[in-house]
Amino acid sequence: MIFLKIIHFISAAIVQGIPLLYVQAPGKLGFSEEGPMPGLENNTYQKLNDFLAELDKADIDYVDTREWMSGPDGFYDTDHHWTTETCFDIAAGLGRLLNSEYGFNIDEAALDASNYDFETHKDAFLGAEGRRTGRYYAGLDDFTVITPAFDTDFHVEIESKETGHSERDGSFEDTIMDSTKDTVHYSFDDSAYYAYWGGDYGRAEASNNKIDDDSSIVVIKDSYGIPVTAFLTNMFHKVNVIDIRYYESDKKLRDVIAEADPDMVMFIYGSGYLGKKKMFKIK
């Protein structure tokens, strides 16, 4: 049923002449059949393999990000999300793939880690699982804030379930980042992971004023796509980010995509949403 939902959307995208790429974030249990502990079964690994095999049969382009990672070490110990360093590597890998396989012309400088500042704060992050068990059981993670070392200038518009419409202008740090998120000291009340974008929103649109072409992508994502899409904003003139879980506008998503007229529509989903029909319900 879920696969049919994806096929339905892809058919509509093809009619519009828009290439589509599905990007699979694996989750910690997606690298082997081994369970999290003795006696607990792990269905994630086989479910991922089966799902991607179906995409192969349907000739749908996808990226299995497990092939770009060395294993579950790319995730936080206290959280289910991948680290910001992993997110940067995935975003840069996507940029190189789009250049080599899809005819994009992304500036290689935006893909080069040496053009970014990596500031690591020790014992600064207590993730979702860590907040449930406590820091003395789970320990603490280091948290790395990655920002461009080059000049940036953005206009960002956000549609939030809680705060409505807002706009930001300025540098990457002033627009894509949220300075209210503490990335230096761990917290039981908030997550440094959301220092990128500020959280999950129904829709966010970033216009990069330093890129003077008309390059544009639409990314439909869950929380695994938050830092990844933040880094993608340095590669395109316009990036539209949509989270179906929080999208409440009366405007149909198909119309939003058509108006954006993107060069590509991209899904970035973790393995936990393969069983959620609503995540592929594009109206």
Spans of model-derived segments:
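Extracellular glycan-modifying ectodomains
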Residues: 1-283
